[in-house]
A protein has these predicted regions:
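Electropositive nucleic-acid engagement tracts
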Residues: 1-27, 89, 127, 275, ...
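Active-site-proximal, Lys/Arg-enriched surface segment
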Residues: 1-59
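An internal, acidic/charged active-site-proximal segment
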Residues: 67-187, 273-280
Length: 305
């Protein structure tokens, strides 16, 4: 797959991780558990899945996944532990010069950040407010009491003729257990409250606030990937038996079908601008139908002759 796609011109590849739930109503499913998306939403039963993807240019390629088992199930592991296993097994493309790990606030644990640094990768992640500096002060106090006039207006253009504007503050700090990093406070409006301020952390050298925010916003590609996996290849929709191994294989089949779709129709992906797996699936179906019609016509002409 990676051999047929054109490499990134700058040699930079993003390793993006995110979790999702596929709702399941079965009460005897071995891997389904009760959960909710946030403190304000209701509970539901679903199959929790971690997905890791590579992103460069217009491409988004799923490379690994793990199912988060219920706490009462055997071989249970926390999502961060599963993510570290996938990080350990990850082999960068041969042309990749820089690997940047992008994730939300649920993944930057101490062991995870240390593993990223040990492997020589960089990270751009959102931090929880419970993290502390080397002087034992919390990020929450820092964000809450930072004066508003220190924020500066910044923007970038993810696509032509479309500008995204943010208010940001950047500083070099020393985090406990991690060391010196660059922290970026980002909010969409100047008068937003501290609760609406996003805390971003990176170990990229000489990174600007504009670059850090632009890299973190590319995490949206994994949301598009999850939507396409659920709608195009039926992620988690297969009805299988109670064996956990068969459930894992059913999820793997959805990712393999997505990879095959990109392999067959990668020429339909534009180098600039958005694209969708729905379009690739439609083009693939039309191509297969056209081949079948042409084959039938050739047989009829051969019989008539």
């Amino acid at each position: 797959m990676l051999q047929v796609l054109p490499p990134a011109q700058d040699g930079v590849v993003l390793l993006i991780v995110d979790g999702t739930y596929k709702e399941k109503t079965a009460k005897k499913h071995p891997l389904v558990k009760k959960a909710r998306l946030d403190a304000y939403s209701g509970y539901f039963r679903g199959l929790p899945i971690l997905i890791v993807m590579l992103q460069w240019g217009p491409y988004r390629i799923p490379i690994d996944f793990e199912i988060v088992r219920p706490k009462t199930a055997p071989h249970y592991q926390r999502p961060n532990a599963l993510f570290r296993q996938m990080l350990q097994a990850f082999v960068p493309p041969a042309w990749a010069q820089t690997v940047i790990v992008v994730a939300d606030a649920g993944f930057p644990a101490k062991d995870t950040l240390r593993l990223i640094q040990k492997r020589g990768f960089f990270f751009v992640m959102s931090l929880a407010r419970t993290w502390k500096f080397a002087d034992n002060h919390t990020l929450k106090n820092w964000v809450t009491h930072l004066p508003k006039h220190l924020y500066r207006k910044t923007w970038f253009t993810p696509v032509p003729q479309k500008r995204r504007i943010y208010w940001s503050y950047i500083d070099r700090k020393c985090l406990r257990h991690i060391g010196d990093v660059t922290l970026v406070l980002s909010k969409k409006r100047r008068n937003d409250s501290p609760k609406q301020t996003k805390i971003l952390v990176t170990n990229l050298p000489e990174a600007t606030a504009q670059q850090v925010i632009a890299l973190y916003t590319r995490r949206w590609d994994v949301e598009l990937l999850i939507k396409e996996l659920k709608s195009v290849t039926g992620l988690g929709q297969a009805q299988v038996t109670k064996h956990p191994e068969r459930v894992e294989r059913s999820v793997a089949l959805s990712l393999m079908a997505y990879l095959l779709l990109i392999r067959f129709r990668y020429r339909d992906i534009p180098l600039q601008g958005p694209w969708s797996a729905f379009t690739l699936k439609r083009n693939f179906a039309w191509h297969v139908a056209q081949q079948q019609i042409e084959h039938t016509v050739r047989l009829n002409l051969k019989k008539a002759a």
